[in-house]
UniProtKB/Swiss-Prot annotation:
Function: Cell wall formation. Catalyzes the transfer of a GlcNAc subunit on undecaprenyl-pyrophosphoryl-MurNAc-pentapeptide (lipid intermediate I) to form undecaprenyl-pyrophosphoryl-MurNAc-(pentapeptide)GlcNAc (lipid intermediate II).
Record-stated family: Belongs to the glycosyltransferase 28 family. MurG subfamily.
Annotated metabolic or biological route of this protein: Cell wall biogenesis; peptidoglycan biosynthesis
Cellular component terms (Gene Ontology): plasma membrane
Keywords per UniProt: Cell cycle, Cell division, Cell inner membrane, Cell membrane, Cell shape, Cell wall biogenesis/degradation, Glycosyltransferase, Membrane, Peptidoglycan synthesis, Transferase
Domain of life: Bacteria
Residues given in the record as UDP-N-acetyl-alpha-D-glucosamine binding sites: 13-15, 124, 165, 193, 294
Gene: murG
One GO BP annotation of this record: peptidoglycan biosynthetic process
Bilayer topology term: Peripheral membrane protein
Catalytic activity entry: di-trans,octa-cis-undecaprenyl diphospho-N-acetyl-alpha-D-muramoyl-L-alanyl-D-glutamyl-meso-2,6-diaminopimeloyl-D-alanyl-D-alanine + UDP-N-acetyl-alpha-D-glucosamine = di-trans,octa-cis-undecaprenyl diphospho-[N-acetyl-alpha-D-glucosaminyl-(1->4)]-N-acetyl-alpha-D-muramoyl-L-alanyl-D-glutamyl-meso-2,6-diaminopimeloyl-D-alanyl-D-alanine + UDP + H(+)
Protein name: UDP-N-acetylglucosamine--N-acetylmuramyl-(pentapeptide) pyrophosphoryl-undecaprenol N-acetylglucosamine transferase
Subcellular location: Cell inner membrane
UniProt EC number: 2.4.1.227
Length: 375
């Protein structure tokens, strides 16, 4: 028997849609009929939803100060509000949950005005602009890294963590293996489509500065943009360092589980996967990230001793070589960082998020949820 309808609203990018998809799987398993409200960009990411359960809502991004452009934007948002009201009158959802991005504004505003229970999920350690605009209206805020104490909305915040993919959960079963001074040292380097270019030049240059003894121990897996792939591979070949270089790895969680040390950007999904699997990391926040969310995510991991944060502007090849050499010769420190990272991982984030969603759909407050039996 179907418990009722829940609508998930998300911007049309993978970062917003993947956690929504993870929650959808969990809610469907519990007997809910789950629909997705999004924008036209979402078609390539919305495979987890049946075609008749994906609803394109008119929306627009608020950017710039041009009066005509702003007028068009607010007109699109108003039309999206009307779209959402029409949809909700038909579906009669028990809950509308937002996952960030401007396309969530019309559905969440419409739902709150129609007295439908609402909540948002924020992946990052600082709220994005859309979620920040909704925070005062919704019944609950689920956070990937947001704390439950301090801050304006702490009383309705629950730190659920960010849902991760099944391969990440499988990789988390592999314990961290510190290596001895004469053993191979597996280094994993990745940075996403925007961030990998810096690593493509900086890491090979740093490896070239390592003492021969340390360089001979390295086994590198590195993500590189397609236009950088050949140059990165050739650089390691000249140095005599075995390296697997590619624009994308389907088995990235397994490669992370095999690594002794990770160098990466600090997007919410990346940091969540590092903590669930439990690996020591040097995080280099993307310097142009909106709202400085990557810096905040990295700081959250560093605060518990799960790794270190270094600004890109501070990473000369010489500094990188120092960090690499220290990591390769301090296995006990890396093992402690791995344990610290794993201690804050949330492998059950999808379940926790679904528990909160069901509580809000049932009319409970966040305080009642916190005082009840928490998983």
């Amino acid at each position: 028997m179907v418990k009722g309808v829940i609508v998930l609203a998300a911007g049309g990018t993978g970062g917003h849609l993947f956690p929504a998809e993870a929650l959808a799987h969990e809610l469907k398993a519990r007997g809910w009929d789950v629909h997705l409200a999004t924008d036209a960009r979402a078609q390539r990411f919305a495979g987890a939803f049946a075609e008749d359960h994906v609803h394109v809502i008119r929306s627009a991004t608020i950017a710039g100060r041009n009066p005509i452009a702003l007028l068009k934007t607010f007109w699109s948002l108003w039309q999206g509000n009307l779209d959402s009201r029409k949809l909700f009158r038909r579906l009669k959802p028990k809950l509308v949950a937002g996952f960030g991005g401007y396309p969530t504004l019309p559905p969440l505003y419409a739902a709150s005005n129609m007295n439908i229970p609402t909540m948002v999920h924020e992946q990052n350690a600082v709220m994005g602009r859309a979620n920040k605009g909704l925070a005062g209206r919704v019944k609950a805020i689920a956070g990937g890294f947001l704390p439950e104490t301090g801050g304006v909305y702490a009383e309705k915040t629950v730190t659920t963590g960010n849902p991760v993919r099944p391969p990440v959960l499988a990789a988390a079963e592999t314990s961290y293996k510190p290596v001895k001074a004469d053993e191979r040292f597996r280094l994993l380097v990745f940075g996403g489509s925007q961030g990998a270019q810096f690593f493509s030049t900086a890491i090979p240059a740093a490896v070239a500065l390592l003492p021969d003894r340390d360089r001979a121990r390295l086994l590198i897996t590195q993500q590189a943009r397609k236009e950088d792939e050949a140059a990165v591979r050739e650089a390691y070949k000249k140095l005599g360092v075995p390296a697997d270089v590619a624009p994308f790895f389907n088995d990235m969680p397994a490669r992370m589980a095999d690594a002794q040390f990770v160098i990466s950007r600090s997007g919410a999904s990346t940091v969540s996967e590092i903590t669930v699997i439990g690996r020591p990391a040097m995080l280099v926040p993307f310097p142009h990230a909106l709202d400085h969310d990557q810096a905040a995510n990295a700081a959250a991991l560093a605060a518990v001793g799960g790794g270190e944060v270094v600004r890109q502007s501070e990473l000369s090849p010489e500094r990188l070589a120092e960090i690499l050499q220290a990591a390769m010769n301090e296995p006990q420190r890396l093992e402690a960082q791995a344990k610290a990272a794993k201690s804050v991982g949330k492998p059950d984030a999808a379940r926790l998020l679904a528990d909160l969603a069901e509580a809000i759909a049932a009319g409970k407050s966040v305080q009642e949820f916190k005082e009840g039996t928490r998983p």
